[in-house]
Amino acid sequence: MTADALPKTANSRDWREIAADLQAIVDTRFVIDDEEMTRPYECDGLSAYREMPNVVVIPNSVDEVCEVLRYCHARAIPVVTRGAGTGLCAGAMPHPEGIVLSMAKFTKILEIDPDSRIARVESGVRNLAISDAAAPYGLFYAPDPSSQIACTIGGNVAENSGGVHCLKYGLTVHNVLEVQLVTMAGERVCVGSEALDGCGLDLLALLTGSEGMLGVVTEVTVKLLPCPQAARVVMAAFDDVQKAGDAVSRIISEGIIPAGLEMMDQLAIVAAEDFVHAGYPVEAEALLLCELDGDEREVQDYAQRVEELMWELGAFQVRVSKTEEEKELFWKGRKSAFPAIGRISPDYYCMDGTIPRKRLAQVLSAMQEMSATYDLRVANVFHAGDGNLHPLILFDANVPGEFERAEAFGAVSYTHLRAHETQEVISYA
């Protein structure tokens, strides 16, 4: 793409000149400033917020990343790094006065070390690809966001991603050992260590979840875990959200640590069942999915205890997965919930906050009241075990006033910042 493909007049910078300068650093084919070619980069998964990129740069090496960042730093040009664009908090939304740096070519799995139980990968490697590469050695990478088939490990580090199994196995910060990054001044930095308990300040915890504000991740070393010998999912359906909330607290208080403990409300249940036919009871007001893993006897005992608890606490249907296929089908419904909601609403606004487990029912009840107040549907799909909520506020951007009501319905995110709420006060270069 040539530097003069399209005049840039949206702001005060001469973007044709900047694109030409960047083409001296990166292959001209991968410095994009044509409007139609840059349009796919105007937003991430939170499509309600968009900004057309001035220039998109797709480097092929760490040296090129360093040179691009040095160039931008010297000219105070903001840089927004993009992984797969699956995020739901506008973290990859372009800055109106900056460029987009896409890590799409950093896709090499550099090393799988089964003896040390680590994987060393470039930042553009897909989350699920790490587990796929480790599977022949009986190992897996634990954090599993719903978008794991597409999201990248660099984006996971930026967002400190979790997933349905984070209750037992932790978030990205608990599973990353070392990160190679480039600062906004173009300097290479290594944070962390392959050792499980490295010396010095824990800068890795500072970096993980910093959403690109501290540098551009180019390489990540993660720890791998042995695949559990056995795993079963207990699916429990309730006719009342309060009962389901009480069940969550009771499971944890019994000393049971599930691999995953997820909850869905009726709107999410119906949408997911219609989408993937997981066998969910669509008449349920709330659905719990509780996975137990470990050795065969331990899993059998825990699954029986959880099943008995669910009946005791008022579930009207309880099923325990009997095969690996059935277990995966139960989870497929949960992990497909977000795209399933997309089939019943033109747009949705995903929020992300954490509350005490004991207040789940109270918060869900308040959401239903707000749903009536703002005349917008809300679907709830969330990590019940640690109280991490993901309410999806459904709206149609083509209907005047609905997006504004959705914004008023929502709130500032607590586990991930909203890029459009911070761009005005944070310097990226």
Descriptions of predicted regions:
Residues 426-429:
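Hydrophobic alpha-helical segments, chiefly the membrane-spanning helices
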Residues 415-422:
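Conserved small/polar residues in nucleotide/adenosyl-binding loops
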Residues 76-78, 89:
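Glycine-rich active-site/cofactor-binding loop and its immediate structural neighborhood
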Residues 108-264:
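FAD-binding subdomain of flavoenzyme oxidoreductases
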Residues 1-70, 87-117, 146, 266-277, ...:
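N-terminal flexible segment immediately upstream of the FAD-binding catalytic core
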Residues 32-42, 222-226, 232-409:
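C-terminal substrate-recognition/cap domain of FAD-linked oxidoreductases
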